[in-house]
Amino acid sequence: MARSDWKRPTTFPLSPGHRRIRLLLSYDGSGFSGWQRQKTERSVQEEIEKALFKMIGEHVRVQGSGRTDARVHALGQVAHFDIVNQRVPAEAFAIALNQRLPHEVRIIESSQVTDQFHARFTSICREYRYFVKEYAHYTPFDRGRVCRVKRFPPIDLLNAYAAYIVGTHDFTTFAAAADQSESKVRDIYTSHFSFEESQWGGRLLMYTVQGNAFLMHQVRSMVGTMLQLGEDLEPPEEFGRRLEARDRFRAGKTAPPDGLFLYRIDYDDPQ
């Protein structure tokens, strides 16, 4: 699908007298209802906006590259905000915000960008990683950061499922019922499983997926379906049939949020 078909805004003007600050940040999502501000629940967005008000006295709306669900983590989330304040150097926001944020949220870097940059709409690729571990090797330090299974399905079979995901597809099967996207079509560039050693002992099964955008619960639904099919040793074609069905009732059980990380956001030019 051509980038012109993504149906995204193309202009992001700054109000007079404002400047735009870009943040690269990470967070442990265990204690949050997700990225987006909620009426009654704790969110990452709200914590950053509160810290900004304490710092510069402005009520600022922070725009993230995308939403993460409750208990989903981020290693490379990107956000931006527009402010009137001209005194604080852009690079100083990272240090100053970290002094005011809860320990679960850290700003890695901050920089000033032009009105050509938008954290959500100028991104070209998002990467998620999902981690799975066998019960036998699960430790207290894995809590909240991996999905547990009795045993790993054959990785060759999992990768045969994952190969069906690459390309431009309608992912209705793997979208949450609450997803309100106008189109369920997404471009997926990379989709594969691999093993890596856990620092706490044992092996981690890691699923990596890269795409232009993702539907609500899409990654977790795809992972849950592939793990379920792999456990039953279903042929690769079965996953393909479920994808093509465009029927969310054909998806398997959605994998838990604990093992999911927003790993990286790529841009043509972050400035």
What are these regions (language model features)?
Residues 2-271:
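Structured-RNA-binding interfaces characteristic of tRNA pseudouridine synthases
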